[in-house]
Amino acid sequence: MAVPKKRTSTSKKRIRKNIWKRKGYSIALKAFSLAKSLSTGNSKSFFVRQTKINK
């Protein structure tokens, strides 16, 4: 089983953590943008069927 020889430095840990956070932030931003466009009806990539409720 592979075992790391030396301890990972604090700066390297911080860099990796920030990259991971940045990826999550950009994905969340895209998801929010898509949800916003779907709710306003400006989406060009999704076709949402509108159902009318008759009372």
UniProtKB/Swiss-Prot annotation:
The keyword Mitochondrion does not apply. Keywords: Chloroplast, Plastid, Ribonucleoprotein, Ribosomal protein. InterPro entries: Ribosomal_bL32, Ribosomal_bL32_plant/cyanobact, Ribosomal_zn-bd. GO terms for molecular function: structural constituent of ribosome. GO terms for cellular component: chloroplast; large ribosomal subunit. The keyword Ribosomal protein applies. Its main location: plastid. GO terms for biological process: translation. It is found in: Plastid, Chloroplast. HAMAP family: Ribosomal_bL32. Belongs to the bacterial ribosomal protein bL32 family. This is Large ribosomal subunit protein bL32c. It comes from Nicotiana tabacum.
